[in-house]
Amino acid sequence: MHEMIQEYAKRLKLSWIRENFHTVDIEDPKQYLLTLFEKEVNQREERRINLLLKTATLPNVSGKPFDWSEVQLGQGLSQESIIEGKFIEEKENMIFYGGVGAGKTYLSSLIAINAIQKYGRRVKFYTVASLANELLEANEKGTLNKLFKKIDKLDLLILDELGYIPLHKQGAELLFQVISMCYEKRSIIVTTNLQFGKWNHVFGDPILTEAVVDRLIHHSHLLLFGGESKRMRESMMLKN
């Protein structure tokens, strides 16, 4: 009987029950079944969360609490609402602006981890350069639509380090397609060390740059890192 239970559990893909059914006390048959199914569901959920974390390709996070002391929040934002990802529910974007080492990448990673672990959301982390390269490679291989479909399933796309490396013309155009595809359908976090007026250095085309900025800042929030001045916020306000 023991072997038959294991075999049936294996066929039904009830891995926790298969390995542990004999360790649960049998006092009440209904409670016994409830306990087995609860454990099975919990294990499946844990595996799902671990898979989401793996596929998100997030940078390593130390686990230290985030230091908000040098971060200026946009209107209507709170630390809790940012970490809880309220903007993801509303399909809004976040622009994190500040110098190197100001904590932009770290905060975006904390938001992503919470979104995955607490809400089971689909997240993907890219540097802008790595996504552009992946898009170019997929285009050459004829698998661009496959990559687009993967991005289309996301709840949150993180684009890190915008401004560090100028993009190839075709890479910039493909990245614009991704941003347009996400517009009002899923949230994007962009981390950057450049004011909007200098994004043309990355995209290399004033018209394309303006289109990118317009789609990103519509329904978006701005966070200033490292005690930056109000110039970035003012430039954003002029765009609205």
Label each residue range with its predicted role.
Residues 6-60:
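Interdomain "pre-motor" coupling segment immediately N-terminal to P-loop NTPase/helicase cores
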Residues 62-85:
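N-terminal pre-Walker A segment at the start of P-loop NTPase domains
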